[in-house]
Amino acid sequence: MGCLLILLLTLICFSLRLCLATDVITFSSEFRDSETVVSNHSTFRFGFFSPVNSTGRYAGIWFNNIPVQTVVWVANSNSPINDSSGMVSISKEGNLVVMDGRGQVHWSTNVLVPVAANTFYARLLNTGNLVLLGTTNTGDEILWESFEHPQNIYLPTMSLATDTKTGRSLKLRSWKSPFDPSPGRYSAGLIPLPFPELVVWKDDLLMWRSGPWNGQYFIGLPNMDYRINLFELTLSSDNRGSVSMSYAGNTLLYHFLLDSEGSVFQRDWNVAIQEWKTWLKVPSTKCDTYATCGQFASCRFNPGSTPPCMCIRGFKPQSYAEWNNGNWTQGCVRKAPLQCESRDNNDGSRKSDGFVRVQKMKVPHNPQRSGANEQDCPESCLKNCSCTAYSFDRGIGCLLWSGNLMDMQEFSGTGVVFYIRLADSEFKKRTNRSIVITVTLLVGAFLFAGTVVLALWKIAKHREKNRNTRLLNERMEALSSNDVGAILVNQYKLKELPLFEFQVLAVATNNFSITNKLGQGGFGAVYKGRLQEGLDIAVKRLSRTSGQGVEEFVNEVVVISKLQHRNLVRLLGFCIEGEERMLVYEFMPENCLDAYLFDPVKQRLLDWKTRFNIIDGICRGLMYLHRDSRLKIIHRDLKASNILLDENLNPKISDFGLARIFQGNEDEVSTVRVVGTYGYMAPEYAMGGLFSEKSDVFSLGVILLEIVSGRRNSSFYNDGQNPNLSAYAWKLWNTGEDIALVDPVIFEECFENEIRRCVHVGLLCVQDHANDRPSVATVIWMLSSENSNLPEPKQPAFIPRRGTSEVESSGQSDPRASINNVSLTKITGR
């Protein structure tokens, strides 16, 4: 009798615990159409809904706190309920079911279970995963989960997977239309062999492919390393037919969406403008569609230019008539057969085939793996008569292609270097033409004796160029001798970035015309340019008298080349020619933040929502540098003039010449010479040369106060009572007049609490002691958590003014407080 009583009490307590939980469905606690279940952290909600322009009722999961209803999973997608009589419950067999008022089952988890039905319950997890659990003697066991049945949205911690041995396949499936969640014609998933690759199908027809996975990103999509890094994507493969992929976003709102038209979107929620923001869309152009140009042809998308398809060198259209009519699907054929295929070359005297090099490519479909190293990769292709091309990727190794080359695309930005096999005769034609040109030039040279003097002068310049190149190599070797420098040189090779010729950049910038000049910094001028293919660029031309040496130049190149994030400016390449040193960036059409923020006219274009979005973007870019990138980066020169704005006024952190990389066991670095900009430097850095993550947080706090107030920090230079903006904000805070700090342009009562919170967080960031300042991750949480209680700020650091010989900088936002120089650093352990 006692044992029976204990068992009864146990069941009562278990049932009571589940009934009190709002994220649980039990055998006795079903919910009806008007009711919902909410996950523990209120991120997701499970209930009934009707799509736009539809009267059918579906049981589904959606984001809970997003005003735009965004459904991530639907139970009865194939069988809507025609009225509001629906209910979700645990059946007597132990399955989670969706039924209508007549008891007809419209959907079921449909699992076979060996235990009693009253020990089953369903729970909506904080990840958006709906799970069916059974309680046994050993604890709760997951019997079914919605993440194992993905639909059109791919959430953090979900997996896409394919196993050819077991037949298991987890892939996205589009809705039939935006108003009909039943399965559509498009799906997206992974193919495991010969290399893991992300693909989109229309029915069974391949529509788009990402290119092979190289261990860090998919190499067939421009900027995929930048996009995917936002999500900490991981992919595992056994190279025998099994592959799986998952990712982790900064928040659970990040996701991928496969829409009913077959496009994959990467989205996250923009709090400032209250809408979904799209960061990536594939396919996005006609060239992205699989095999648009057919075999042996490359597609290059340029708005307004036709045709997008071009036969690669050594090939011609298979049908000129079809090609000229815009039908490129037949592709191209060789002009001359390969030597190993020629029937006229069996005497052993034939010349070997060669390779033509093409850059910035999406590699063709269906590569094969070779065990050859980088030096032997070309020979391994030449030894195989069926091999038509090769490429080498450091993450994959040697890649070989046989037969027709399909789905090639030329990018304007990043891409793979690719080598296509051609007959020796194709190179002879070029050689003959070169001989004619050379003879003509020599004859002309004899007619102009004065060119001898010019040639001698060029020889002298060439020696000077060699000296500078040798100096660069010596600096690279010196950089490698440092532990941190070795990481830079080994992991981020300069040769992996495009090397621009000086003449190309001179033409692009109209010979560095004053009309193309965007601005002037301490290290040189920045010019707008346009490359021949139509891509707008920004060229930072370092002054010959600049304080930025080779080490800083190399530092900026190697640091920013692989640190790619939507809130960091992207480096496209560089130029080293003679004494010229230039950096080529993506062009930011709206210039820098201070050009808007401190201009009486332009600042009116920055309303509060826009300014908050800028604050959020700066924080997320800094979060990536400090925590989410493969190496911890301290910027050291964060200021409004180093925040660039794109066409939508989204911020991008720039100018990494003074940035420093921390290894895994360091959290603080000591320097013998302080570099940066007065007013943005933390006190421990300005006074003692110590810098860390919290030094950047201090700079972030100053920028935050500048954005809220619309006033430059240095505008208090002649103010005897307030040495800087932080001191002024602190005085207003203590007197309860902090709202007086706010720029009148942005103040509206509906935003007052949010603006006050930003002032509060800004003061927390500029506190005197580094340990008192929050991390960037905490700053992001503080800014987005409306109901959280923030700690009271302590007095900011009021740094005494110093002369320019003591405080040095990479820019010239205030000529009284910044000049340029080189920083020597030493590492300090924890």
Swiss-Prot record:
Glycosylation sites recorded in the entry for this protein: N40, N53, N82, N327, N384, N432
Catalytic activity: L-seryl-[protein] + ATP = O-phospho-L-seryl-[protein] + ADP + H(+); L-threonyl-[protein] + ATP = O-phospho-L-threonyl-[protein] + ADP + H(+)
Comp. bias (Polar residues): 806-830
Secretion signal span: 1-21
Domain PAN residues, every copy: 340-423
Principal location class: membrane
Disulfide cysteine pairs (residue numbers): C287-C299, C293-C309, C377-C398, C381-C387
UniProt-annotated stretches for the region Disordered: 789-830
Any one GO CC term of the record: extracellular region
Name of protein: G-type lectin S-receptor-like serine/threonine-protein kinase SD1-13
